[in-house]
Each structure stands twice: as C-alpha cells, then as structure tokens.
C-alpha cells in the first residue's frame, strides 16, 4: 500500500482507493452498484434517503455508502442479507406516501424510484392509513410540479445552493411534513434552473412544455450540440416521429459537465412556433405571397445576378455543414461577400481576427485559473456554462474582474468592476500594465 491509497474489500474483491474517498464512489468505480436517490456526483453529500445502506464488517448497523469515507482494511458487503434488508426497508418507507401515478407520470420509463422499486419493493403494501398529499406549486413556465411524488432527496435544493449559487428551492417543516418549495412562492429564474428536471429521481419536477406529449420509450435519442451556446454544450434531442419533443444534457466533463442552459433546453419550441416561416414567400407590390419551392428557386436564380452586387449573411448559429453549403453557393455565383458577423460594426482590425477564437485554455481549465478578466460580456446571460465555470474558480479563490458598460448580478464575489470608459482610458494613457495593476 502506498501513502496515496488504502486497501479495502468490496464483496470479497480487493480494491485500492484514495484515502477519504466516499465508499459509493469506490463501488461505482468497480461496477458494484449500490442503489441511491439523494447521492449525485456533482452535489454535496446529504445522506437523507438512506437507500445506499451497506453492511460494513464491525459496524453495529448498516451505513450509508454515500457518507462513509473508506479506511484501511475496511470490508464492505453490498449484497449481504443485512444490506438487502435495510435497502428494502428504506424502499418500503419511501413508498408509504408515494402515489400510484406511474401510468400518467412523465418520469415513467426513466424513473429511478420505479426502477429500484422493482428490485427492492414489496408486492403488497402493509400500510393501511391515508397517504400524504402535497399541494403542487407554480414555480414558473418551465418546470411543472407534482410534489406528492417528492421523496425529499434535496437534489434540487442542493443544486440551487451549490451549482447555481442562487438558492431558489428549500425545505420547510419537519419529519413527514417536510415540503420542498420556492421561497415566498417565487418563480425559479436562474439560467440553469431547469437542470433540476434531470436531477429529480422521481416525477416531482417535470419539463412543463413537454408534459404529457410523449413517453420515454417512444422517442429516439439523437446526439447533437446546443445551437445557441457558444461553448458547444453537448445535448441529446429526443425525437418522436420526426418531431423534437425535448432536449436533455449529454455528459461531457470537458465542456458542460452534466448541465445545460435553459435557453438550450427549451429553444427547440421555436421550431414549431406558429409565427415561424414554414413556406417560401415572395414580395409583390409590397405584399408577401406564399409560393411553392420551384417558383421560389426560379425567382431567387433570376435575382442573383452580378457577383459584385451580391452579399450573403450566415447565421452564427448555423451548422458547419450549412455554412459550407452557403460558401459553395457563393463560390458558384462568383462572390466573396459572405460573412457571419451579423452584429459586428467595427471591421478595421479584421485581418488580425483569429480563424478560431480561443480562450488560451480549455473550458474545463477555466475553473482552475488564479485570475479571470471578462470584457464586455454579461457572461451569465450569454454563456451560462462559462459563468458556472467562473463561479467554481471564484469559490476556489480566483480573482474575478469585469469590464462592461453595465454591472450585472453574479452569484460569486467580483473583485473589480471597470466601466468601458475606465478601461479605454487606462489602455490609452498607461497601457495594459496599468490595467493589470488596477486589477491586483
């Protein structure tokens, strides 16, 4: 054994682990699955669901694996009669008040409680008293609530406190009367708030626009990239008979981890908006008239004459393939007037623009920087995933500074704010060194 590892035994199998590593992390690493509800690798340990109880040699009672650090010589049994009995007892308690909503619940087919109840639940309930009922909360247009289904794992609460930095959900009352709700009945409005839908292990928090529109097993999962996210967050599109029904995050530790911005989760609704242009139109005598594709292409071909008089603008959100096709069309027409910088006004230094803008480090390394300076951006609104990484850096002690025309709200400590005029004056009068000194 080295100083960096300890030797333990899991179900008779010798395993090396880091000192202080939580037992549930070790069992996951070797494929010895331990059931859980409150544990999540991106959140702090709560140990309040008790589903991950395991048997440890010498312990007087089963111990929650999510809250037990490993130690030298520990012998763990995840499938012993005592461990299984404890897990089944926990499941029975969880199901006492849980409603039989599976046939209509949007979480059906991908519900962690449903899956584990098959393995650890009883066929017949011994509980004859009335079930607890909780009033649903209206917490905004994006997340629907069925709080009678809530098992109080507090994943959503910890997400607000630890990931968002803006606690929006909390617990009130105690014991079996505990209720999770927003403070003073407010809506949740953080840029990442809808990630609680994915975190919820049951059907208590659901995707409101998607509600009752499809079942999990009916849809096809397509891997893609978020179209409105400048960092390229990885996502899955869930498609039913050619129609996008919902967007969920695709895990990528180097970019978005396991989160996506609400904008990227719900922007697919624009595809099917009533005011979206679905058919080609032509303007005649100041009025728009719908035409078929053949007439539209003929009209476009007739109008596209004279390479020097043509210009093409591509959406910055267009795919690489779409951009390539537009460039191919521009080449065929003999024009070089093609651009994607729709909002840019100053092109005086465009010859020095990088072909591929780059931070100088990977997105994942951003959270390990000692100092971060953001210029001219409301990073929370424009790139929520980057804002999340910057917040992680700030929590580790990084100095974070902003230069912009307006001061925006951030859920971490900001060391310096410079107005655009202040930054310009410093650069003009004293150069970059003065800016660095100002930010120290």
Residue ranges: model-predicted function:
Residues 1-22:
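Generic start-of-chain signal for non-secretory N-termini
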Residues 23-57:
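A basic, amphipathic helix-loop patch mediating RNA/tRNA/ribosome contacts
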Residues 95, 99, 146, 153, ...:
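Catalytic alpha/large subunits of respiratory electron-transfer oxidoreductases
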